Amino acid sequence: MGYDSQVRTKKRHRITVVCTNCKKRKSKCDRTKPCGTCVRLGDVDSCVYLTDSSGQPESSPSLNDADPLRKQSTPAERISPGFIKKRRSSQTRQDEDHWQRVRELESQSSLYYLPIHEETPFFIDLIPNGFYLETKRSADNLFGLFTDRAIENRDPYLQAMVTFRSIAIKKMMDKLGSNGNNVKNGSLPKSFEALSTFDADDERHISDDVVDKGNNFRMHQTIHKSLFNKFAQYRENNAKKFSSETILAKDYLPPLKILESEVLALFEEKIYNMIPIFDMKILRHEITIFYQNIVEKGNPISIKHYDHMVFCIILLIIKICRLSVQFSKLTPYIYPVLQEIDTSKFLALVKHYLFETKVLRKCNFLQLQCLILLRFLHWCAPEDGDGPETQYCQILMGTIISSCKEMGINWYCFSHPEKYSFKINRHTRPSYDIMKPSDYISVFRKIWSYVLFWDRKMCFISGEECQIGKTLQCHFKEEADTPTWYIRMLTLDNLMKKINDTLNDDPGKVDLNLLHRLINDLKRNFHILKSLSKNEKETMRHFDFEMEWIIDLFSLSLLHGEMIFYEYDCNITKFYKSFQDLWDMVIHISEKCYNYFFNSDALEVDSLTKFYTNRIVEIVANKVLVIVPAFILRGDRFKTIQYADKKKMIEFLYGVSSVYFNEFGFEYYRCFRKMFTAKIAYKILNRSCEKDAWRIILKFLLNELKLEDNGDSYIDYNDMRLKDICPIILEFQETVQKYDGYRPDILSIWNNEFYPIGKYNDDMTGFKFQMRIKEMQEFLDMEKYSDRFNIFSSFYDHASSQLAKHTEVDTNISITNEQVAETPQKELLQQPLAPALPVNDLIVSEFDVIEDIFDPVDFVSFF
């Protein structure tokens, strides 16, 4: 045998010619790692090369098989530390059927999902006017990309309208204050002063009107006062102070038998799946011990032994269960004892005890569960826990996430569950007798999946950046490995995190094509997961419902940002398309809101879970109210949008506002306080054809800038200047001042010179706006509240008979600007420029401009 034949040839283990992505796409691959094509398409994380030797992908860690906790693998079975190798035993018939269904659903979902190949990045700027940061006495806030404030700051039309509205309200409050008519309520925040004052003035006018005396006036007076008092009581209760020595648990808690039979039974059956952070057997044990030692024996609540945390958990569970029954609208006889429990002081008690511990330094198991329950309550409760735009939720959420990481509740409880080594001390609560290491891992998984989803959820709702920066690709082998809905959603976490990164890594340069592709992937995968759960005894329909609405909300906010970008970029074709797409999305979401309120049986949402689903519906409906004015203010720029179409949009806004505030305004503090500015916005937009709202807003703000320059502005010198609050108006003023010797119509300057997309003609693209009247009909024929009190139409609205009596004198002294108001929009820029008005005349004229917007029927006493 020759030498060559005796030497064994060494086999080369070279990588395949292309990465798995390029192989799937049938595209070119430069064989770098990651390859250039994947870098360009944003698929860096999934750019994988398969080797001939092992056949294992070189990818980020993934959880391919999450075995039950008590079936730990031996070291020989592990392919790598913490990850369990797939066993070669044949699958059961049930597992085969399960994954056969997955493949069938994937093929079905492909009918409506078309993957995008070789799509070049397309970047848009979601912060054309920068980030929106607000500082005030009590808090500083950087608002997320999709909050109301950020949307208004991004949109020049909404920004100008909101600026005008705030200045007009300030002037009116100064007018009332000088007359001694301002109203204050010590239990309400300072921002409520305008609401109370305007409503009191409204009430005075109604009481003076003989026509309105009687039932209408008494109803107005009773309902309005009760709402102000109700929300003032919320704040007073939550601000109550306690002394630990005087707190007796039996004064606040029902007997143990009632707690177990009514409260815990309801919690376990209907609510636990929403917040599955407990082992219910262990929780019941701790509650029983607490009642035996504290309630029945009358012992003081021990902070050292963490009795106070068990007490807080009981209080929060009772309050959450009571909310469930309260918002279900079921007969009070179903849970009579529960509804009799006074929970008004519970939140103040919880806050008192939470800060008795070193919550900012260290955390234990019960304390973490209490914090999570508090976060859940802030989300669902009618009090203003999260703030009107969820801007106050990140600090508590950050505390929860930090506490989880400090306690070892993280991705390791899924990827390396066998690596945890516990030392459970004798005084730990829950004790070792009742809670073993395997129980810890089980609850750790439940808590981490819950906290993780809420972190991702807030990114989709408000556009804020996720606080948990790590994700893993999770694939569970059996349905038994996903005991909660949140654990099942871990398979979507990688996609949700990619969406967050694409959005927040650089908001000024967001890859829109990649974002659309990721959203489509998320919809497709969620559709598969949702379909797989249909055979379960408990479908958890409210979770699927919320997830669908969250995705729709994200799409709505993104569409608005997309439209604004095309407008700034003067991309007329894409602007028109996004304008129509955004309007269609608004109509679609509004229909969903209508069905939620008036056809809820078809949604298959349990009425006892509505206290939870109400929150996402409230956020989505409010977003519609924020965005619709942007369409109305832009209406004059489209030939195909006539005045009659704008009136339909305004009627639609009125209908959506009536539904939103009548369904939520009586109960939710944050909705009630938004009603004031929403009503003002409606009055701004609901103008006659001659008094175009956008022209009047521009004119008012230009006059205000002139007053600032002359030092005669009503704005306090401690406040920011208009030119700093709304820089786009300062730029517009500079453009207007270029027309020396001429006085053109300001709308012509705005559309043709300053904001040049308006100069394009609809005929250039063949664009024809589709109003979708048929889909809007429920809101145009708003008869739902015709036979009962409509809170939206009632608040801040004077009787029409007040018009003549209060405006006759004002009309005689006002300097009207009817000629300017009636100027055609497309007027040629050739008229001589009239001399500037004196400062005093500017002030009178400015109030006249406010009268053009606010019908004297509403705010006649201010002039």
Swiss-Prot record:
Question: Could you give a single Gene Ontology term from the biological process aspect?
Answer: positive regulation of transcription by RNA polymerase II
PROSITE patterns membership: ZN2_CY6_FUNGAL_1 (PS00463), ZN2_CY6_FUNGAL_2 (PS50048)
Name where it's found. Answer: Cytoplasm; Nucleus; Mitochondrion
Q: Which InterPro entries match?
A: OAF3 (IPR050675), Zn2-C6_fun-type_DNA-bd_sf (IPR036864), Zn2Cys6_DnaBD (IPR001138)
Give the start-end ranges of region Disordered. Answer: 52-81
Residue spans of biased composition, Polar residues class? 52-63
Highest taxon of the source?
Eukaryota
What are the coiled-coil residue ranges? Answer: none
Q: Which UniProt keywords apply?
A: Cytoplasm, DNA-binding, Metal-binding, Mitochondrion, Nucleus, Repressor, Transcription, Transcription regulation, Zinc
A cellular component term (GO) from this record?
mitochondrion
- What's an example of a GO molecular-function annotation for this chain? RNA polymerase II cis-regulatory region sequence-specific DNA binding
Any single Pfam family the record assigns to this protein: Zn_clus
Q: Which regions of the protein are recorded as binding DNA? A: 19-47
Q: What does this protein do?
A: Transcriptional inhibitor with a significantly increased number of target genes in response to oleate.
The family note in this entry says:
Belongs to the OAF3 family.
Q: What is this protein called?
A: Oleate activated transcription factor 3
Q: Its encoding gene is what?
A: OAF3
